[in-house]
Structures are given as C-alpha cells and as structure tokens.
Amino acid sequence: MINMLFIGSDHGGLEMKEELVKVLASRNLPTKDCGTTNDDSVDYPDFAEKVAGAVSRGEAELGILVCGTGIGMSIVANKFPGVRAALATDEFMAQMAKEHNNANVLVLGGRVLSVELATKMVNVWLDTAYEGGRHQLRLDKISQVEAAVRSGEL
C-alpha cells in the first residue's frame, strides 16, 4: 500500500493533472496535490521541487509530475537525492520505469499524451512491482554515483 503520493504540474500539465487526481482518488490513494491550480503561466521547477523534494525527504513514497513535454520536470526532479524520475511516453515505458528502475516519480507530458493514455500509464506504473535482482545492483551503482557527486568525489 502506498503511504503518500504527491502530484504536481505547471500550466502545460494542469488539465491532465486534474484528471489524474481523480484517478488517484478513485484508487483511494493518499494524495497531495502540489499545484498549480490555474492556467496562469508558472515555472515548472517550482512544482517539480515540491514533489521531488517530498519524495527525497521521505514525505511521499511516490510522485507524479506533468508539464508540457515532461522534459523540464524530469530534469529538475532528478537533481534530488534518491529520486528516480522517469519520463514515460507509453505504457511499456511506465511499466519498465517501475519494474526495472524502481522509478519513484513518473513524469508525463500534458501536451504530448492524451488523458486516456496517461491514465493507463499511471495505473500500469502503480500496479507494477519492482523486480529487484540484477536491477537492484544497477540501482546501487546509481546510488554510489549520486553519493560520490554529492561528496565532491566525482
């Protein structure tokens, strides 16, 4: 059971985010909507910081971010320690993001995906279990690189 999921978007992902909030509610998932709340132009880093920061600090187990393409949100989210944000464009990528990479943040493009496809992707991502095994060895290497960068070793 997921303890908490944070979701956020900029203006380019607002419509999709609002629909995904309904999907998450229908699944009875504890969810915090981190905004934006209207279609005024806003800066995507502000919302990526809220969601990825919560995941990084352990306040949220998972996060979902939506901007126009998903690219900007992915870049920001992956700056946070312990965040494995995956930009996905189809159901297979959403599945592999969790199954092989244990992605704890799913990033979507509100201007490049239909709400129907995004809904399917979110459901697949949430329903997919992390496989572990050889994939955990790779995630351990990522964690080692992350620690070395943060310490100034790399």
What are the functions of these language-model segments?
Residues 47-87:
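Helix-adjacent hinge/juxtasegments
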Residues 30-41:
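A short beta-strand-loop structural module common to alpha/beta enzyme folds
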Residues 6-26:
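Glycine-rich phosphate/diphosphate-binding loop of Rossmann-like nucleotide-binding domains
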Residues 2, 59-61, 102:
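Short, high-confidence coil segments that cap the C-terminus of an alpha-helix
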Residues 17, 44, 48, 73, ...:
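A general structural signal for well-ordered alpha-helical segments in protein cores
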Residues 27, 80-81, 101:
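Short, structured coil segments at secondary-structure junctions
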Residues 6-8, 12-13, 91-154:
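C-terminal binding/interaction regions
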